[in-house]
Amino acid sequence: MDKRKELILKTIIKEHIKTALPVGSEGLVDKYNLDISSATVRNEMAELEQAGFIAQPHTSAGRIPTEKAYNFYLQNLSEKKLSEAEAKIFEKLLAKKDEISFKQTAKAMAKISDNAVFWAFHRHNLYYTGISNLLHQPQFSETALIYDISEVIDRVDDIIGQIFNDLKFGPQVLLGSENPFSQHCSAVVTKYRL
């Protein structure tokens, strides 16, 4: 993929993550000050659509990223580094190796990521926090997604039990059809040795 297509695709993904709305060429050019015309962006978007990176949910709508696009985005994402203060907080909490410290770590992770965190101490002992962070995201203005996520939360202990033994050390991204929690969201999972 050439640099211009990559820039357009990453911009579409970022905008869709922020708004949960289909993204149009004119909006991209205006909002992100792209140094190309909206006609050029439309042509590039047509090629990205042919390649399976974006889709048009209905006629005359903008485009939305596909699972293939999100995978590309994650593979090419530069890691966000924790600040020194954040890293020290995690080191201090994880050094204690007790359930209270792990819960505090999960809360800190939820705050920093502005997302939900699920922490399994073992197969049948689960803690979660940050659900309100998750539900404040723009895509949850759709009732169907709220229902989907509430079903996930209702059965999260069963899902954790199913994947617990298959988890590897180091982050794994579960996205779309590869995500046992829900195809409508992504999850980053890892195993941590006590």
Protein language model regions, located:
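Contiguous, well-ordered alpha-helical segments that form the cores/surfaces of helical PPI scaffolds
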Residues: 9-14, 188-190
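Short alpha-helical segments that sit at the start of domains
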Residues: 1-10
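A short alpha-helix capping/helix-coil boundary motif
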Residues: 4, 21-25, 84-86
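Conserved phosphate/pyrophosphate-binding and hydrolysis machinery centered on Walker-type P-loop NTPases
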Residues: 2, 22, 95, 99
